[in-house]
Amino acid sequence: MEIKNVCIIGGSGFVGQHIAHLLAAREIKVRILTRRREYAKSLLVLPTVDVIETNIHDPRELGQLLVGVDAVINLVGILDGDFISTHIELPRKIVGACEQNGVSRLLHMSALHASTNGTSAYLRSKGEGEKVIIESNLETTIFRPSVIFGPGDSFLNLFANLVKRLPVFPLGSPNAKFQPVFIEDVAEAIIASLSTPTTFGQSYNLCGPKIYSLRQLVEYVSTITKNKLSIIGLGDRLSYLQAMCLEFLPGKLMTRDNYLSMKMDSICDCNDESDLIKIFGICPTELEEVAPLYLVHNTPRGRYTGFRDRAGRKN
């Protein structure tokens, strides 16, 4: 199967922009569907990328914008809000639009441990969304990553910003486990599967090479950014109460449903060889290889260097 035109739904986000850049480098035409065109500023200069502002939840608009594409990648996901509309109804509309336009190839981003019996509404909705994809008549591939890190992420960068302001850090769910996976590894796996028939009808768990507790990740970020930090790990009850309080603050750093999601460790089965290696031949990138390169901008020296670079100074 030769893929020449790809539509990325939710392509203006962290993962979508990385995939779009890699596809553009391969001279594959990319159509980005997004709610806000300004979110994809870095893509506007790419000659093979077309950024279209649209209402992706409108079946008519969606159907019109899938005309002429060879494959669709759905990256739309939220951590808070209307999970049913975003994670279940939208995939159903995408499947319908693909069938309407003869687009047989559909790649779908889910989440590690997504299940109709999941510990949270988020994981259950992701599981229901997978069911919609699997039951379609399309050539589908589902990806279930752990937390994704890389330049521009909203995970390590969030902690980097918080530790600058909080010398004492009350950390909910400090023992929750994660297996962070590098954005470039995720993007390469998705692109590799586009035209690979052996990935049709399959689901892949994407994890990095190491497992960390949430406490270890926050401590690592504070070390890299040179911020002295005292972490107070909260037990289950206080973690839940913290999430409930944060849920009602602007920005929603945490919600009760996020807390419930973290009751299930975001790690791959330690008895299985990583799908990144086994299926895609990608050696998972260690967090320590990459994170310092972008977290350094959250240090006083790094911020000074960033300002100097933007001012065009070399010394």
Positions of the model-derived regions?
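Substrate-positioning beta->alpha
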Residues: S154-F155, S173-S195, G201-N205, Q216
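Substrate-binding strand-loop-helix patch
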Residues: K177-E184, Y204-I224, G233-M244, C283-E286
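A hydrophobic C-terminal alpha-helical subdomain
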Residues: R237-N315
